[in-house]
């Protein structure tokens, strides 16, 4: 998964200049303090997904603002967010992180919107299975169609991690209005080929190759 996300982050850098990085789907940085790789996926609706990799394992935290699991919906229906409603919201947030090993939970720093969470999953380094938060559905879920399963946005947000170049291209053709010439270049990046000027030109002729290489090297993507 980490390799896939790095490839997507490189493709987003190619498609969008650094000044407009807010438009990118996947952003990446390395947290020196916690020694972990930090990826953030930002949907066009403002929902987000953090994927954190460390030597202790992987932590994924997502937020779908329309989900009935959104902590902020607990305040709806009240004239103001009184002390009781705030206490209930904080308790609900804590329950989302219940069971996560301390070494993984410590990776979630202040700037990662800790209170904005509708699902959480993690995997210890010595395991192959994923653990998920076991949170009872709040009363806000009762207002939804009983035939619709609310997973906190997990399926929708995790779908932004594209396993193949074909799937990335299908998304990028709409989001970035990517030309057909870009498909082969995207496939070569997915195949871990060295990034060339021709590949950049095929994907986005408006971007400067050297500035892309510089940003990728500084961030640790190359």
Model feature map: region roles:
Residues 58-59:
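Primarily extracytoplasmic ectodomains and periplasmic/lumenal surface modules that are beta-strand-rich
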